[in-house]
Curated annotation (Swiss-Prot):
This is Multidrug resistance protein MdtA. It holds the Pfam family HlyD_3. It is found in: Cell inner membrane. It comes from the Bacteria. It comes from Klebsiella pneumoniae subsp. pneumoniae (strain ATCC 700721 / MGH 78578). The keyword Nucleus does not apply. The lineage of its organism: Bacteria, Pseudomonadati, Pseudomonadota, Gammaproteobacteria, Enterobacterales.
């Protein structure tokens, strides 16, 4: 029984020894078959990352070069598109609406016929006024002929002086009647003209407010249609009161200030116009001031009551040092960036940021054009550490990026 146990333990030990030898053989063979790292480089780690002198993998980072650009300075505010002019087209006379001469949404010119009121009664009134005028003109002409005869007869005492004066008064009276008749004719003609309702301004016609055949009057507040002038069109937007001095200073420079209208999401520029005016008082409730910009809007990109984001260009900073916004970091001591030297070693530089948006930021101090800054992989960095500069390509493993030479050193 004891000998049997010894044999079983011996067999198990032999199996373990054989398995260990096989593992050592295949492991040593796989190691010798792999390529040796290049001289001066550590062995590659998982994913192809290079190792340092003591076997530690170099941190992969992405980098960008600081550039020198002309950077515009914008003041931004929320705005609403408003028509340059809005007119409710109403009838000036009472009558039946015979016809409409526009398509809803159509662009019209000032003077274009929009609607026609039944002119029948106004034609009759004009004819009556013209008839009365003709009658009174004949009376005046007869009175003047009589006056001429009286002036001759008074010289021979065939008529008295009083009769002459009476005739002169009759001529003056008849002349006054004719003037009144002429005014009545003009009034009747004006009433007739008003049966043709025309566009008072250039603009876009809205939806009709009344249908053909309805009796309308000059007192109707609804009107026939609303006309809005959209060529040009305005944008009214607000800025905080702290921006007033900047706007006024830019206006005093004597050049037109450009205003951009962006969509609700602030991702697409809709149109570009010019600042038209600045309101004369601040809204005490909101602490803001209203501004109005005008756009040609020939492409009809802006529509009345549309919400937009307005950007007012007040200045352009020349020769500004610009880096990607992702490179700018914030720490306990303020803003900083990680700068790469020619050996791909990183160092932390304190900087003073200036104008910035979601993509770029201007560095007012602490950096020079040509400096390389880290934009990704920042959380793995330590002062003086050597890194691997890579570029990320969609769907592929990051590859080493070509090193860009440039001016280095902090900008004071």
């Amino acid at each position: 029984m004891k000998g049997s146990n010894i044999r079983r333990w011996g067999a198990a030990l032999a199996v373990v020894i054989i398995a260990g030898a096989a593992y050592w053989f295949w492991h040593d063979r796989g190691t010798s078959g792999s390529g040796a790292p290049a001289a001066g480089q550590g062995p590659q780690g998982p994913g192809g990352a290079r190792h340092g002198r003591f076997g530690a993998a170099l941190a992969p980072v992405q980098a960008a070069t600081a550039t020198e650009e002309a950077v515009p300075r914008y003041l931004t505010g929320l705005g609403t598109v408003t028509a340059a002019n809005t007119v409710t087209v109403r009838s000036r006379v009472d009558g039946q609406l015979l016809s409409l001469h526009f398509q809803e949404g159509q662009q019209v010119k000032a003077g274009d016929l929009l609607a026609q009121i039944d002119p029948s009664q106004f034609k009759v009134a004009l004819a009556q006024a013209q008839g009365q005028l003709a009658k009174d003109q004949a009376t005046l002409a007869n009175a003047r002929r009589d006056l001429a005869r009286y002036q001759q007869l008074v010289k021979t005492n065939l008529v008295s002086r009083q009769e002459l004066d009476t005739q002169q008064s009759l001529v003056v009276e008849s002349a006054g009647t004719v003037k009144a008749d002429e005014a009545a004719v003009a009034s009747a003609q004006l009433q007739l003209d008003w049966t043709r309702i025309t566009a008072p301004i250039d603009g876009r016609v809205g939806l009709k407010q009344v249908d053909i055949g309805n009796q309308i009057s000059s007192g109707d507040t609804t009107g026939i249609v609303v006309l809005t002038q959209t060529h040009p069109i305005d944008v009214v937007f607000t800025l905080p009161e702290s921006s007033i001095a900047t706007v006024v200073q830019a206006q005093k420079a004597g050049k037109a200030l450009s205003v951009e209208a962006w969509d609700r999401t602030n991702k697409q520029k809709i149109s570009v116009g010019e600042l038209l005016s600045l309101d004369n008082q601040i809204d005490a409730t909101t602490g803001t001031i209203k501004l109005k910009a005008r756009f040609s809007n020939l492409d009809d990109a802006l529509f009345p009551n549309q919400f937009v984001n307005a950007r007012l260009l007040v200045d352009t900073q020349q020769n500004a040092v610009v880096i990607p916004a992702a490179a700018l970091q914030m720490g306990n001591e303020g803003h900083f960036v990680w700068v790469l030297n020619d050996e791909n070693k990183v160092s932390k530089h304190s900087v003073t940021p200036g104008i910035q948006d979601s993509q770029k930021v201007v560095i007012s101090a602490g950096l020079s054009a040509g400096d390389r800054v880290v934009t990704d992989g920042i959380d793995r960095l330590t002062e003086g550490a050597k890194v691997e500069v890579v570029t990320a390509s969609s769907g592929e493993q990051a590859q080493p990026a070509p090193r860009q030479s440039g001016k280095h050193g902090a900008r004071s």
